[in-house]
Curated annotation (Swiss-Prot):
Stored SUPFAM superfamilies: Amidase signature (AS) enzymes
The protein's name in its UniProt record: Acylamidase
E.C. designation(s): 3.5.1.13, 3.5.1.14, 3.5.1.4
InterPro entries with a match to the protein in the record: Amidase, Amidase_CS, Amidase_dom, AS_sf
Length: 477
């Protein structure tokens, strides 16, 4: 095994090699530092990186290995943390210049759990300001490029995390998802991203502890690694009053087994609007995999209307405004994005009646969803209406000139599942003719996270993607 290919090992492979003493955390760290130095300047995925600290941490993990101490399930495996999540002693900037000196005084629960499992913290990844849209650019660190097509969007808001995984900057990345922020960039970067059921992973991103729409999620290159990372991060914690007990069976074990007879509903757009014909064609081709696996496929779409207005006025706008209302927004022009300031002013125009109506719509949507899923086990769709598009473009070109809400939401097939709190995963479905990744989304009912992972793992078995990597000529300057 050489340093030249260590960075493409899965987390599962790395952990097994460390456990069998065929690989040391020191070797992993050296390979990863070289990879970050070579690739990150081109894509700007990791924005806080301390190579000396990585080396020191790896040395301690190697000492434990050499001493024959009990090793954790991620011993020596690199992971990154999104810059919305607290890491003790490092800035939690939210991608905002006014927060550049906001030094965390403790770790988020997920950071403690990943480190406690022996994981090697590699650095913090880029995010748009406050994680507010489906791309990754900000006034503090600049844009993150898609490793498959430089100059194009990596998606967001976990764009740095997804780009890092896609480019071989560690097999595991923590993301967070409030309207698709794990699944959007994972789809655009050709990796696996899971939004679990609300409460499976305790959230400490939002000050509002009873918010139930934004949660941490694992981003990986393989489904097995996704299940492994979820096993580490899952479980209740007093920091999150909505967190729930762990499943009795590990997600790694529960994701095994076939899907013969699985009732699959296929929807080309979830009833939400236009889909790029090439994206739809890639997803339709991928859908044939479920027939090969013995699943039963029916084209069907939940009749829940258009939930984007309720997502906007009932969740997104008031949620962001309440999280960041201490900043003096008008005096931050030029320091933060003008569109984010517009969202804050939009919140000032909302009334309690607006928010209440949106919440009522969400309840009706839940009823529609649960009734619909009485006939199906999973609902499969494109993850997004488009493959990646140029940086600094909010949305696909067909939404140019549309309202801010439409540009932010109307190309996403992800946010309904934040409103419903159920699990949804995106997996690589294939590529457009010019080599841009396309994602396929698999969703299931509340607390059926293991089923989502098992379905994704079976799909991966017949449509493998781990050997498909962006060319170094694209990502190395």
């Amino acid at each position: 095994m050489t340093e030249q290919n260590l960075h493409w090992l899965s987390a599962t492979e790395m952990a097994a090699s460390v456990a069998s003493n065929n690989l040391s955390p020191n070797e992993i760290a050296e390979a990863m530092i070289q990879r970050v130095d070579a690739v990150n300047p081109s894509i700007n995925a990791i924005v806080q990186f301390d190579r000396e600290q990585v080396t020191r941490d790896a040395a301690e993990l190697s000492r434990q290995q050499e001493a024959g101490e009990k090793l954790g399930p991620l011993h020596g495996v690199p992971f990154t943390i999104k810059d919305l999540t607290a890491v003790d002693g490092l800035p939690t900037t939210f991608g905002m210049k006014p927060m550049a000196d906001n030094i965390a005084t403790g770790n988020a629960v997920v950071v403690d759990r990943l480190r406690g499992a022996g994981g090697l913290f590699l650095g913090k990844t880029n995010t748009p300001e406050s994680g507010y849209y489906g791309g990754t650019d900000n006034h503090l660190y600049g844009p993150t490029h898609n490793p498959w097509k430089l100059g194009n969007s990596a998606g967001g808001s976990s764009g740095g995390a997804s780009a890092a995984v896609a480019a071989g900057l560690g097999p595991l990345a923590e993301g967070s998802d409030g309207a698709g922020s794990v699944r959007i960039p994972s789809a655009l970067c050709g990796v696996v991203g899971l939004k679990p059921t609300t409460g499976v992973i305790p959230q400490t991103i939002l000050a509002g502890r009873f918010y139930n729409w934004a949660y941490h999620g694992p981003i990986t290159r393989t489904v097995a690694d996704n299940a492994l990372m979820l096993d580490i991060m899952a479980g209740p914690d007093n920091a999150d009053p909505l967190s729930i007990e762990r499943a009795e069976t590990s997600y790694v074990e529960a994701s095994k087994g076939d899907v013969k007879g699985l009732r699959v509903a296929w929807s080309p757009n979830l009833g939400l609007g236009h889909v790029d014909p090439e994206v739809l064609a890639v997803c339709l081709d991928a859908l044939a995999a479920f027939e090969e696996l013995g699943a039963q496929i029916t084209e069907a779409t939940p009749q829940w209307g258009n939930p984007s207005e309720s997502m906007w006025s009932g969740i997104w706008v008031p949620g962001f405004a309440s999280e960041y209302d201490l900043l003096d927004w008008e005096n931050q022009r030029g320091e933060v994005d003008d569109y984010l300031i517009e969202i804050m002013h939009e919140a000032e125009r909302l009334t309690g009646v607006d928010v209440g109506r949106a919440d009522a719509f969400r309840g009706d949507m839940w009823d529609t969803w649960t009734t619909f899923m009485n006939d199906y086990d999973v609902l499969v769709s494109p993850t997004l209406a488009s493959a990646t598009f140029p940086l600094r473009q909010f949305a696909p070109s067909w939404l140019e000139g549309a309202s801010l809400r439409e540009q932010l939401l109307d190309w996403l097939f992800t946010y309904p599942y934040n409103m419903l709190n159920n699990p949804a995963i995106t997996v690589p479905a294939g590529f457009t003719a010019d080599g841009r990744p396309v994602g396929l989304q698999i969703a299931a009912r509340h607390r059926r996270d293991a089923l989502v992972l098992r379905t994704a793992a079976n799909f991966e078995a017949v449509r493998p993607w781990a050997d498909k990597k962006p060319a170094d000529s694209l990502v190395v300057a």
